[in-house]
């Protein structure tokens, strides 16, 4: 019988096994079962770790990460079970344990909201409380970039840019469960990632004051896929077309980076209920590719 136990920290071997399970699930399902932040948490002790071990196989077969509540987000769980060990009730048992540990307001992500996740949600009596759209478009036939008078575009020059980057990010995303409330450590963690490229972090400055108005952080996933990782505009600078300017600047950069691909594509994530942003991205040629759903127990 599969054993399921909480850990305050993971061994190096457990971390390696979990990364292998995530990779296997991604290949099998066509969608990553957990977000990048979960992988960053594996060596840390900021979150709780629920590990499923199959005694016959003598191996880790499932993992749930439980992030505690923050000022902007409820407790959030993310879950993966190895494809070879599914349909045994492990996923449902781990989801039940994670939500119970997280408390009344805890949620659990279903990346791609696949049928297996929907079935588990029905079994546990969960309902969708939040949806995140993944939108994509080809990196071809891009509109030209237009920069307003008084605005200067530059790329990230190093940690000296961080105070302004944090100011704009936390103003633009004060409401956001994951993107809001960033600190120096959040930027430093991403700067340490293998994918980080300072030439792909675009910043728009006000010529007169020198203040940062907005930024676009791009990410390259592989030879065929790039991402609009974060676009943030200072609320005080809204209405100047900066969102479109920064987005298109990043798209042209990604198109150049992926120029050897026969089908270069860019993706982004946006809240399903952010109608204005969804409309903007549709105007830029993006269409919905998949939907991530956050589930929770909802009182009658």
UniProtKB/Swiss-Prot annotation:
Binding site for 1D-myo-inositol 2-(L-cysteinylamino)-2-deoxy-alpha-D-glucopyranoside: 36, 178, 219, 227, 269
Reaction(s) the record says it catalyses: 1D-myo-inositol 2-(L-cysteinylamino)-2-deoxy-alpha-D-glucopyranoside + acetyl-CoA = mycothiol + CoA + H(+)
One Gene Ontology MF term: mycothiol synthase activity
Name under which the protein is recorded: Mycothiol acetyltransferase
Record: residues binding acetyl-CoA 2: 231-233, 274-279
Residue numbers binding acetyl-CoA 1: 79-81
Family: Belongs to the acetyltransferase family. MshD subfamily.
Function summary: Catalyzes the transfer of acetyl from acetyl-CoA to desacetylmycothiol (Cys-GlcN-Ins) to form mycothiol.
Matching CDD domains: NAT_SF
Domain N-acetyltransferase: 4-140, 151-300
E.C. designation(s): 2.3.1.189
Keyword terms of this UniProt record: Acyltransferase, Repeat, Transferase
Subunit structure: Monomer.
Gene (UniProt): mshD
Top-rank taxon, per record: Bacteria
GO terms under biological process: mycothiol biosynthetic process
InterPro entries per UniProt: Acyl_CoA_acyltransferase, GNAT_dom, MshD_Acetyltransferase, Mycothiol_AcTrfase
Top enzyme category: transferase
């Amino acid at each position: 019988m599969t054993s399921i136990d909480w850990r305050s920290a993971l061994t190096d071997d457990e971390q390696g096994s979990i990364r292998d399970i995530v990779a296997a699930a991604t290949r099998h399902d066509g969608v990553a079962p957990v977000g990048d932040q979960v992988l960053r948490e594996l060596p840390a002790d900021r979150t709780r770790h629920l590990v499923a071990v199959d005694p016959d196989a003598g191996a880790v077969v499932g993992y749930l990460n439980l992030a505690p509540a923050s000022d902007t987000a409820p407790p959030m769980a993310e879950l993966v079970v190895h494809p070879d060990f599914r349909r045994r009730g492990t996923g449902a048992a781990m989801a039940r344990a994670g939500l119970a540990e997280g408390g009344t307001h805890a949620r659990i992500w279903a990346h791609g909201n696949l049928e297996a996740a929907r079935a588990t949600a029905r079994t546990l009596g969960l309902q969708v409380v939040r949806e995140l759209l993944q939108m994509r478009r080809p990196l071809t036939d891009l509109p030209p970039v237009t920069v307003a008078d008084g605005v200067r575009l530059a790329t990230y020059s190093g940690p000296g840019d961080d105070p302004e980057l944090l100011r704009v990010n936390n103003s633009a995303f004060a409401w956001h469960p994951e993107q809001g409330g960033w600190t120096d450590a959040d930027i430093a963690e991403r700067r340490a990632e293998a994918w980080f490229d300072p030439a792909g972090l675009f910043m728009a400055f006000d010529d007169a004051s020198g203040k940062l108005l907005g930024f676009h952080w791009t990410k390259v996933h592989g030879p065929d896929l790039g991402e609009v990782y974060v676009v943030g505009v200072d609320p005080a600078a809204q209405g100047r077309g900066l969102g479109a300017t920064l987005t298109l600047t990043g798209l042209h950069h990604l198109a150049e980076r992926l120029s050897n691909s026969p089908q270069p594509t860019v993706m982004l994530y946006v809240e399903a209920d952010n109608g204005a942003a969804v409309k903007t991205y549709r105007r830029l040629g993006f269409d919905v590719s998949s939907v991530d759903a956050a589930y929770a127990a909802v009182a009658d």
